[in-house]
Amino acid sequence: MRIAPISAVLGSLVAAGVAAGVVLQAAAPVPRPAKEFTLTLPSGKQAQLASYRGKVVMVAFMFTTCPHCQALSKVITKLQNELGTRGFQAVGVAFNDEVNTPNAAGNAQVTAKFISDNGVGFPVGYAARPAVMNYLSLSDVERWVVPQVVIIDRKGVIRAQSAATGTADLQTESYLRKYLGDLLSEGAAPAKSGTPSKAPAKKAADKKTS
């Protein structure tokens, strides 16, 4: 996984792949209603997560330069092909520095290259890092890794989210296939905020840097 910076100093360490993730703040509660989120597709068109309401949605927040994100995108493509007809929709959001430049055409090009290089079979766009952190309820005072995964049920409720330091199950094909299949089988049954969910235990992913 890729360790995300909490300061300029840590940012340089991250680039060298030597920073280690340590949670300093509790993760956002799950389940909870999903906030609206907008991403920009390589075409320049903006897409909103709300447009997928009624489907089970998996959102992968990634760095285009992160090998773990690249590997996960291949897993998600397989799941999209298998489960799409049942109402599953995957979405990718790139938010590293390479897609957050003043050059919109350059941002789109980097995102499109990520899609092409990894054979991605689901929509991937880009967004500003502050917007992503706000959506994930991550803080500048904690260290976090990518990819970060959020799974939203048909009613627009977040049912699973990666821990700041990563959740291995949410990057594992066999686990995701079963978990998503269970959510798809629920139909439109909502999850009540504040009640226990069937989300994976917060088992941290192996602390490998890229």
Regions found by a protein language model. Give the residues of each.
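Hydrophobic beta-strand anchors of alpha/beta hydrolase catalytic cores
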Residues: 58-59, 90, 149
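Structural microenvironment flanking redox-active thiols in thiol-disulfide oxidoreductases
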Residues: 71-119, 129-134
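Thiol-/selenol-based redox modules, centered on thioredoxin-like
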Residues: 146-210
